[in-house]
């Protein structure tokens, strides 16, 4: 299959993956309205073309949390990444490091912190959920510190699991899920050999290290579901702010009031996010939520955004709407599934090229020059 655009990797991933894995990363919650709106709302935003601006010198570099990024992009935390390619978290982290952007390791990764951090030569970020098992949270934070993790991404939009109906149809969950997954793997021999066999162990490394025994897919669903904490409030995060002395980012903000609360709490950044449409269907897309949040807290902390970003044009749109940087989730997992580390490297190159074209043709010579003026004000607005 020819890969000429960043969006080509989705079809390539679908060909290679067993359906339960493809639909797990591709799907959203309930009827998936928010999942679709994330992409549609963002792609509908018109960029303002400018010409004859002498764009011979162009820089995508940006500073974020005392790090220099080659472009305002980081790889988002995605659970089970190691099921999409052999030791997938390591491959994705290497690709990000080679490009000069951060990789964020998920709490529920296949590869543990201690395997991923030594594989790269730049600081890594780590994502943590709010869980009832505070002992696990403290253990994960201590291990992240010991591994040299610089930035903590704290996910707060999962006090309860979202209803992901597609998973029951695909075999990720639901009746006879385990035998259905085995049958699907048998019909995808390339994945079964490369990941299913050579990619072992498939337990969730960060959780297994704490529990002292392998935590596989079935255990993961049960353990994580039992540990979500709907009682969580800002005061429950104070011990983490005291324990973690590096940058702390709150992920899952969609409302300006919550963004203001994050400032009061002392967060270093927020991620405007609806969890990729995987939690509450019917909420605002990140693109629609971002401008009001930027108006409320811009300059008081770093604003990142995710959900719906598929191309370099989308990155430019999010920056113009008020983000300082973005997180790529599904986009990099598609590339990883299709072509491993090389696929993620190529994806990031394509994202950069698309950003450069957009910046040249909107007259923005640096990331700092991308603003609301880079967008077309709709008639009647």
Curated annotation (Swiss-Prot):
Substrates-to-products reaction catalysed: (S)-lactate + A = pyruvate + AH2
Complex and partners: Homotetramer.
Active site annotation, chain numbering: 275 (proton acceptor)
Main EC class the enzyme belongs to: oxidoreductase
Entry keyword Cell membrane: yes
Record's GO cellular component terms: plasma membrane
Entries under PROSITE patterns matching the protein: FMN_HYDROXY_ACID_DH_1, FMN_HYDROXY_ACID_DH_2
Name this protein carries in UniProt: L-lactate dehydrogenase
Cofactor: FMN
Binding-site list for FMN: 106, 127, 155, 251, 306-330
Coiled coil, from the record: none
Keyword terms, alphabetized: Cell inner membrane, Cell membrane, Flavoprotein, FMN, Membrane, Oxidoreductase
Domain of life: Bacteria
Family assignment from sequence similarity: Belongs to the FMN-dependent alpha-hydroxy acid dehydrogenase family.
FMN hydroxy acid dehydrogenase domain mapped to chain residues: 1-380
Zinc as UniProt keyword: no
